[in-house]
Amino acid sequence: MPVKPAIIPGLRYKDAPRAIDFLCDAFGFERHAVYPDPNEPNIIMHAQLIDRGNLVMLGNGTDNEYKRKAGIKSVAEAGGATMGLYVTVNDVDAHAERARAAGADIFIEPMDQDYGGRGYSCRDPEGNVWSFGSYDPLAPA
């Protein structure tokens, strides 16, 4: 059976349980799968959060072979965000208010974009950059 084409971001958090709660409360993700360490339930080995068929994977930034070989760093370890995520939403202003109420650091308020649509940008509690907008880059031109 063919695999559905997808690019799935993987994020590392110092406090993954808190990040999962935040991403669900602030951005509307739902828990698809959460696998805590059987010996340390506050350590999330792997989690999958879903939003309208799109997936984000995350876990604690625990030391393991993959992290060492790939050089993966959290935002704090890197000294700042090294990438940002863009998520399409229908009601940008309502989404921003939900995110703000949950504690998101909104550094670009909702605004109309020159290239179309409306959007805003924020940081989650560990500094990952998220942008949300109504501009759909995959829509037919």
Locations of the language-model features?
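Vicinal oxygen chelate
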Residues: 1-10, 20-123, 134-141
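Conserved beta-strand-loop-alpha-helix junction that forms the acyl-donor binding cleft
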Residues: 13-15
